[in-house]
Amino acid sequence: MAELITVARPYAEAVFRLAKDEGRLAQWSEALAWLAASLAEPAVSAAVANPERTEAEVVTLLGGILGDKAGHEVRNLLEALAENHRLALLPAIAEQFEQLKQVEEGVLTADIASAYPLTEAQSAELAATLKAKYGKEIVLKASVDPSLIGGVRILVGDEVIDASVRGKLHTMAISLKS
């Protein structure tokens, strides 16, 4: 996963700069989201991965799925990815593009993993605390991970805040071993 993100980052940054310079962040965001969602479909994924298809056929297929959302620049991106056998990066490129777009718009996404589902009040309190810490609007993406035992693990950008029982036990175990 980390390798995909590393390889996808330059593509996402290049597309973001282009979209920002042209004032087309929303259009690129929509096109990349459509491409990522399309590749999540088993039939499309299988068709793209089919070694009997040429790069041009794959680009035409994906361009057809996008319809009028596939401008010249989007087709250029698809051609570059197909030529380098990196179409599988599209979901990671879309995700990183969205992160860059949110930073540009002054919004951060916080991935919150908790041992139990968060209440509305807990979510609001977490969002307010993170907004105060980062000085930006916060969008929460919550998930439940029972292996945390209790507490939460928060991921904002590249920063991890581990306030889980599992994390604390892990830290204590390391301390005891040394």
From Swiss-Prot:
Keywords tagged on the record: ATP synthesis, Cell inner membrane, Cell membrane, CF(1), Hydrogen ion transport, Ion transport, Membrane, Transport
InterPro entries per UniProt: ATP_synth_OSCP/delta_N_sf (IPR026015), ATPase_OSCP/dsu (IPR000711)
GO molecular function: proton-transporting ATP synthase activity, rotational mechanism
Subcellular location: Cell inner membrane
Keyword S-adenosyl-L-methionine attributed: no
UniProt membrane topology term: Peripheral membrane protein
Pfam families per the UniProt record, alphabetical: OSCP
Record keyword Nucleus present: no
GO cellular component: plasma membrane; proton-transporting ATP synthase complex
Recorded family membership: Belongs to the ATPase delta chain family.
PANTHER family: ATP SYNTHASE DELTA CHAIN
Function, as annotated: F(1)F(0) ATP synthase produces ATP from ADP in the presence of a proton or sodium gradient. F-type ATPases consist of two structural domains, F(1) containing the extramembraneous catalytic core and F(0) containing the membrane proton channel, linked together by a central stalk and a peripheral stalk. During catalysis, ATP synthesis in the catalytic domain of F(1) is coupled via a rotary mechanism of the central stalk subunits to proton translocation.
Subunit organization: F-type ATPases have 2 components, F(1) - the catalytic core - and F(0) - the membrane proton channel. F(1) has five subunits: alpha(3), beta(3), gamma(1), delta(1), epsilon(1). F(0) has three main subunits: a(1), b(2) and c(10-14). The alpha and beta chains form an alternating ring which encloses part of the gamma chain. F(1) is attached to F(0) by a central stalk formed by the gamma and epsilon chains, while a peripheral stalk is formed by the delta and b chains.
The protein, known as: ATP synthase subunit delta
